[in-house]
Amino acid sequence: MARPDGIDAVFAACDAMALGALDAFAASDLMVPRDIGVMGFDDLLAGRFSRPPLTSIGPDPAEAGAALVEAVLGADAEKRRRVPVSLVARASTARM
């Protein structure tokens, strides 16, 4: 598979999808991150051990857990809560 023109990177909705993209690109002889970057969301443990290790956006576990408990217990069900996230930069992306 040739890299589509103008596409430098893929941002997947979750790390599981990003890991699938890593596999697909490897099977297509595209080198990550030389030919295309890959990034996921949720910072799964598996991303640390993929080849190359997956760059991800990771939510703060304590804040995410607290938000989940509040939602399950029905505490102010109409309230939206933002959970802080951070970039976990690994080798699946390169600086442009």
Sequence positions of predicted segments:
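Flexible loop/turn connectors
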Residues: 2-96
